[in-house]
């Protein structure tokens, strides 16, 4: 069985790790430190942008795991950095809104491409 098959060991480890993480989160209810709370929604939206971009690339058969991981981490860090700088300048709310709008447009663009690819609509 090659690493590109549907049931490869690497894929199964990833799925198992995701399942364990979800269960642990539901059982232990981890708290988010107050320092990080303003940046968490932005980080989640940035991560969703990378995930939907990765799904689109996978369906278009141009997915590269290295590009996905770098995109995921870079999106989250840059979005958080922009909000942090905005907070320091006193315009954090406006920059947060701008980031949500930009990433939201990208997410909807990727979901539209996914819909066209999957359903031909």
Curated annotation (Swiss-Prot):
It is found in: Cell membrane. Disulfide bonds: none annotated. It is a multi-pass membrane protein. Keywords: Cell membrane, Membrane, Transmembrane, Transmembrane helix. GO terms for cellular component: plasma membrane. The chain crosses the membrane at residues 12-32, 35-55, 67-87. Belongs to the sbp family. This is Uncharacterized protein Mb1855. It comes from Mycobacterium bovis (strain ATCC BAA-935 / AF2122/97).
